[in-house]
Amino acid sequence: MRYLRPLNSCLRGIRSGSSFQPLAQSLNTRIRYSSSFAKTDMESINTTERLAGLRELMKKNKVDIYIVPSEDSHSSEYIAACDARREFISGFSGSAGCAVVTLEKAALATDGRYFNQASRQLDNNWLLLKQGLQDVPTWQEWAAEQSENGKVVGVDPTIMSASDARKLTEKIKKRGGNDLVAVEENLVDLVWGDSRPSRPKEPVKVLARKFAGKDVKTKLEDLRKELLKKKSSGLIVSMLDEIAWLFNLRGNDIPYNPVFFSYASVTSSSATLYVDSSKLSDECTAHLNENGVSVRDYSKIFGDAEVLSQSLDAEDTKVKKFLVSSRASWALKRALGGDAKVDEVRSPIGDAKSVKNETELEGMRACHVRDGAALIEYFAWLEHQLVVEKVKMDEVTAADRLEQLRSKQKNFVGLSFDTISSTGPNAAVIHYKPEPGNCSIIDPNAVYLCDSGAQYFDGTTDTTRTLHFGEPTEMEKKAYTLVLKGNIALDVAIFPKGTSGFALDVLARQFLWEEGLDYRHGTGHGVGSFLNVHEGPIGIGTRIQYSEVPLAPGNVISNEPGYYEDGSFGIRIENIIMVKEIETKHQFGEKPYLGFEHVTMVPYCRKLIDETLLTRKEKHWLNEYHADIYSKTKDFFKGDELTMSWLEREIEPL
């Protein structure tokens, strides 16, 4: 759960001499994309002129209400700067939300992670719809309410999923409104004009088998078996991480996510990658040819989809439908012929990708040890700078140092998201993003929350630790310990196969709930293997979709409960855990039982733990975990007395 910095490239410090060549500047230079709309993260901008321009275009297109989603044409959570339309029109830079603009009003809807941030960033042209709160309408409900009396609602069909378009249409119809209108030219792009960033054209690289663990031919064979089971003519793939995983390729088009703009189609006899071929090296082209994958230009997907749709009519078969992800765009589904020829499903590629193979699992273990060593060195250094050297250090300078330490680790590629380095009240902003010139000096007498991660060739990391370099208050210690207890409870959980993350969420919240406390974000998200740090379809939380996908051995997921007091402090503890089978004395109903293996190797903050709130079992678990960290990371600190001293102090048994 974090915000994506709008940069033109995401893998910023790729090691020279590796199979991936440097795609950006040195890690010693912090790169930032600066567009006409980009301002500091917590500063509002005046959107009056932009809204006026948009409303003029709405009138010309005979649209009364215009929807501006966060996503790009691939339903990406994290997007390239050229696709940050919702941010441009609203000024809100969070990674989740939807803007609804009428000829008189404008509303921005977002979830609890971003209430604080949105309140700071939206100017007085905007109404904030706090999703999930009682008596607050969803953005669909608000848009439908505005559509009464025959008003027309429009959207760019390439950036709204077919399922979202259908749900919105249903809401509008219930209000007596018209059908949702597909506006073929994006109106925000027209307002943005020449200042809109260009689309990235970064090179695509082959991911070696020693990191991928499974070759492309095997993945295609497995996928075709799934298509046969579903009696489908083929699958059209629009999710960028699914395409990268399927073809063992990695790119650099979206910040922090090693993916590239593309589509793909797979049938029983063919596989096609739709991509700008100028981005493919000779190695990529040969790799695709060897695996029976043809290449077509990215722009050809919609025309080819129409041809595929027509081919179904000519086939002498009972199989009459293509599969698309439930997150595929409305435009793509229309090109394929709509409901008559398309089934929206949970992607079989997404399901396969979420179950890591043994090579990927071993890579996740290894990269988390190296990443943990970098974090341990960072926290030891930071404490020394603040407490001993009395350095006045801001949040960005500290984050830069952490990135530098990570860059020294084997297989390092870049960050997996923009580091959340937050002191005191900033830590209560769940997706806080410090910027140079608009960040705080780290206060050693306040809570410091650091949520950070990296991309390595052998895995993706995401770790949050909350520290205190002075004397924490009793409430800070209590909150931290309650969050820690929830983190431990989830880590040690044992549950029958078929259990979902929805069912496990209560384990992490239970101790906070006993005190009448809670947090407004999910407890866990899936994590990719040198792919997106947020990966579906699994998750741990209260979202209903998490009840639909049971956890399975090989899943990699985060465990990150928290607690936040606006204007005061924030607590979050995050480990990455892997689902595995557990040997139990009994197996009721002959059903296997599952549990977790933690791979994050960073100690908890000793100073913030209230030992009186921990049980004997929790203390034992904590001591065992800290001993494991020490044994796996100590060799990284030979000759480094400062770091070794800090580590030994933090892991001293309770």
Curated annotation (Swiss-Prot):
Annotated GO MF terms: metal ion binding; metalloaminopeptidase activity
Binding site for Mn(2+) 1: 462, 560, 574
Entries under InterPro entries matching the protein: Creatin/AminoP/Spt16_N (IPR029149), Creatinase/aminopeptidase-like (IPR036005), Creatinase_N (IPR000587), Pept_M24 (IPR000994), Pept_M24B (IPR033740), Peptidase_M24_C (IPR032416), Peptidase_M24B_aminopep-P_CS (IPR001131), X-Pro_aminopeptidase_P (IPR050422)
Class of enzymatic activity (EC top level): hydrolase
Gene3D superfamilies registered for this protein in UniProt: Creatinase/methionine aminopeptidase superfamily, Creatinase/prolidase N-terminal domain
Residues the record lists as binding Mn(2+) 2: 451, 462, 574
Keywords: Aminopeptidase, Hydrolase, Manganese, Metal-binding, Metalloprotease, Protease
Enzyme Commission code: 3.4.11.9
The keyword Protease is annotated on this UniProt entry: yes
Matches recorded under PANTHER family: XAA-PRO AMINOPEPTIDASE 1
Family: Belongs to the peptidase M24B family.
Name of the molecule in the record: Probable Xaa-Pro aminopeptidase P
Organism whose genome encodes this protein: Botryotinia fuckeliana (strain B05.10)
Taxonomic lineage from the root: Eukaryota, Fungi, Dikarya, Ascomycota, Pezizomycotina
